[in-house]
Amino acid sequence: MRKDERERDTPAMRSPPPPPPPATATAASPPESLRNGYVKSCVSPLRQDPPRSFFFHLCRFCNVEPPAASLRAGARLSLAALAAFVLAALLGAGPERWAAAATGLRTLLSACSLSLSPLFSIACAFFFLTCFLTRAQRGPDRGAGSWWLLALPACCYLGDFAAWQWWSWLRGEPAAAAAGRLCLVLSCVGLLTLAPRVRLRHGVLVLLFAGLVWWVSFSGLGALPPALRPLLSCLVGGAGCLLALGLDHFFHVRGASPPPRSASTADEKVPVIRPRRRSSCVSLGESAAGYYGSGKMFRRPSLPCISREQMILWDWDLKQWCKPHYQNSGGGNGVDLSVLNEARNMVSDLLIDPSLPPQVISSLRSISSLMGAFSGSCRPKINSFTPFPGFYPCSEVEDPVEKGDRKLHKGLSSKPSFPTAQLRRSSGASGLLTSEHHSRWDRSGGKRPYQELSVSSHGCHLNGPFSSNLMTIPKQRSSSVSLTHHAGLRRAGALPSPSLLNSSSHVPVSAGCLTNRSPVGFLDTSDFLTKPSVTLHRSLGSVSSAADFHQYLRNSDSSLCSSCGHQILKYVSTCEPDGTDHHNEKSGEEDSTVFSKERLNIVETQEEETVKEDCRELFLEGDDHLMEEAQQPNIDQEVLLDPMLVEDYDSLIEKMSNWNFQIFELVEKMGEKSGRILSQVMYTLFQDTGLLETFKIPTQEFMNYFRALENGYRDIPYHNRVHATDVLHAVWYLTTRPIPGLQQLHNNHETETKADSDARLSSGQIAYLSSKSCCIPDKSYGCLSSNIPALELMALYVAAAMHDYDHPGRTNAFLVATNAPQAVLYNDRSVLENHHAASAWNLYLSRPEYNFLLNLDHMEFKRFRFLVIEAILATDLKKHFDFLAEFNAKANDVNSNGIEWSSENDRLLVCQVCIKLADINGPAKDRDLHLRWTEGIVNEFYEQGDEEATLGLPISPFMDRSSPQLAKLQESFITHIVGPLCNSYDAAGLLPGQWIEAEEGDDTESDDDDDDDDDDDDDDDEELDSDDEETEDNLNPKPQRRKGRRRIFCQLMHHLTENHKIWKEIIEEEEKCKAEGNKLQVDNASLPQADEIQVIEEADEEEEQMFE
């Protein structure tokens, strides 16, 4: 380091370093302009297409470019002047001259009519030959060696003309004269080809060409005088050559090298901004001395790449907070190798452990390689006990959809992934890595708790004497388009929710330190150096315990990241220290160590309010209407809604509280307003569950979107808005009604619904919902809404409303067979389901007034969108048995621990099975509703069968109108699809129902019914329970025996069983009638013809008597 820099850094060593420079000053200084990821450059503009005219196509055919506009304008003026001159000459002549001219013209035309075609052919031949030879012989001086072609017509014809005039012997014998004249022509042409050094093959071509065109002139121009033939041939041939050379001279031939640009054309380049080249941390374009004194940095191409912006940020932060340690960097002092080797040894010990996940092992190997690279380089010596700060305002959680072959949201394993491991040490003697498994989404539904999404410098700080913090190299992730659109919609709407929810109660604490993992993605660090909206407030301080050092971040405001387009957070430290005591675990060596750590200070209230007001004005600028709506409570906006939503709320919610919701009666009652049934039911359910207040959903935007959504459903027999409303009602019923025997994890519904909506964002709380129209009778009942967070249930309800959006009334197989655009777009996989999800989200992102989720923060919206898409894709019946097998393995397998409500994967699986059951709930309704839904699906099937027959395709099963098989369709559907799904869902204890007292003989009757229906799983369990109870009573006799045991009555299973029984009876009757008809036909076929006729007559007489 230079002397002046050391002198400038001396005051910083005596006092705490100043706060980071403001972003405005940073952006104004010249050196800071190099800290972003882009550079200015210039590129040549794209060449505009030439005009598409007849002349353009002619030039393209001739392999030349058309002339410029100025040349074309000059040519037009010349032709106009020539036409005017000819017209004036004709008008100036008298009638006598006109008659003589007409006679001469007729004579000329009659003479030329026979010779015009040969002359034109000769001209074209010379034109194309000249074009070919000009292109073949083009050199650096373009066209300079091609003008000899103008003498080619003269050699072909003028020599023949001179011989005809001077040598009389050529006029004798025609054959001998023709041969002599041809030899003369070929001799002249051969001498001509020797002058410009023509290639041999080109010379031979010219000789053959000369002989051919001479023969055409000799044989085709018989109508002209002999002396005139060579002259006209030479004239038209010269014209063709001259035209070809002129085109080559004045116009640029395509494919030729462009002429050298003059100095003035350099200014025609367009200025652009392009991204810098991504390279490793040691190849940043600047010398190592500019960053780390005079130390030399060796490039290691095998290491992962760190962006230029990240390296600049790290170095800038070091210069601000670690300046006292730069004083010895000029002397070549680097990192303390003993500390680095100790850290490498610890990593090596961790790698020996075979129980570590593969992700952790790969990350530890990367860290070991990094430390090996650092040990061979000379760097400034950094205090080992000073936290190395890293900034992650735009951290992105891993999306399980993008994990390729990994199966995160399905399956029995829910192990967390470690995209980037950070060196952590325990204070114990073993020194092993302590990793905690966090499986709960803290309200926002992030992949990790928000302690793990906070700044990595507040992570695990080593308590040993050789502690040090190392840089991590996270994997760069691409930004999500959906989140970018969501952030864009927020700018047009109200201000988002001010903070994220952090739940410290769900984060286990290890013995030595809290386990933190680095987030997956880095923000473009130029945002921190150039933008005033991303300001870090820091001060140095010392704390005596590790608990005081642990602070997480809350989002006090939001802005947009310039590198990925996501909504980023402005960090303000407002969290409390963790309650776990860490200093009791310290060893004797650690007691003598004093840590100097960084802490984030709380920003003054006045400054924070000012920044919030500025951001609010930025988001709501130019949209006063949306700003007023966002500031008004939802209750004030009800005046904008349909009155039916408010007036008939009680009666509607009372009807919907029944599983057999008479939705078709509601459609008939609404009449003309039946097109709004989905939005009205959706609004009623959100009011009932309190989701509007919980997530601060603006009512007007909510109604705007769902009215537009229901308008997107087509008027088809089954997959219409009424079906979507029925599925929505089913998922609401299954998640809010009492379930016998379900254990509730959260019972404080009343407190949560009555509390202020901002309280849901405070630490340690997760929002749950409960239905206002339903109460839990006693502790023997539970509810799914008590075990699934409100955000996930809201995603389930929205997915139910979206799940068949823009359904065409055809199956996936039909779209694939007909090569529909959707099938091609989605590669024949879950075509309709992908189309429903994509179209519904595209509708949401299309207009700002549809953004009813504007108060969800970045992580909540990402989680919400993921859940909605997964729920919609789960409705694909092609994947039905995969989901069913996975659900049985999780919930009903003997070796399984059952559903873990703390696992987000298990909760997602339950929601997927729930919406699948709601989507095919028709057979589980009462008989009348079931028949109405059956009529709709059959009519839709018949329409597809008719179209298949029209297209010449094989008609799909059960879709042939000419051979209806309604009973077989429903019986097969219940037996193979609906029945197993309902049985598995019931066996898992998730179906709503009620406890009833079982009477004597119930078991026997239920056993008989189950034998008929092939559904005896429940009663087998009941028999096992009864056997266990009898054994227990025998071993421990009690003074009083209960008279009977309670059973669960489920309305859904009851209707399913009854409908299945009825369809089976119908099938048996049809088969019986069919067998009797076949038997009658066989008997009739065995009788004589007369007897057969007599039987038919008798039957007719009997029928006539019956009708009489």
Swiss-Prot record:
Tissue spec. comment: Abundant in adipose tissues.
PANTHER family linked: CYCLIC NUCLEOTIDE PHOSPHODIESTERASE
TM regions (residue ranges): 73-93, 114-134, 144-164, 175-195, 204-224, 231-251
PROSITE patterns (alphabetical): PDEASE_I_1 (PS00126), PDEASE_I_2 (PS51845)
Biological process annotations from GO: angiogenesis; cAMP-mediated signaling; cellular response to insulin stimulus; endocrine pancreas development; glucose homeostasis; negative regulation of angiogenesis; negative regulation of cAMP/PKA signal transduction; negative regulation of cell adhesion
Subunit structure: Homodimer. Interacts with PIK3CG; regulates PDE3B activity and thereby cAMP levels in cells. Interacts with RAPGEF3 and PIK3R6; form a signaling complex that regulates phosphatidylinositol 3-kinase gamma in angiogenesis. Interacts with ABHD15; this interaction regulates PDE3B's stability and expression and, thereby, impacts the antilipolytic action of insulin.
Name of the protein in question: cGMP-inhibited 3',5'-cyclic phosphodiesterase 3B
Organism lineage: Eukaryota, Metazoa, Chordata, Craniata, Vertebrata
Sequence ranges of Basic and acidic residues compositional bias: 1-11, 435-445
Presence of keyword Magnesium: yes
Composition-biased stretches (Acidic residues): 999-1033
Region annotation Disordered: where it falls in the sequence: 1-32, 405-448, 999-1042
A Pfam match: PDEase_I
Species this protein is from: Rattus norvegicus (Rat)
Residues noted as binding AMP in the record, renumbered to the chain: H719, D804, D919, Q970
Cellular compartment(s): Membrane
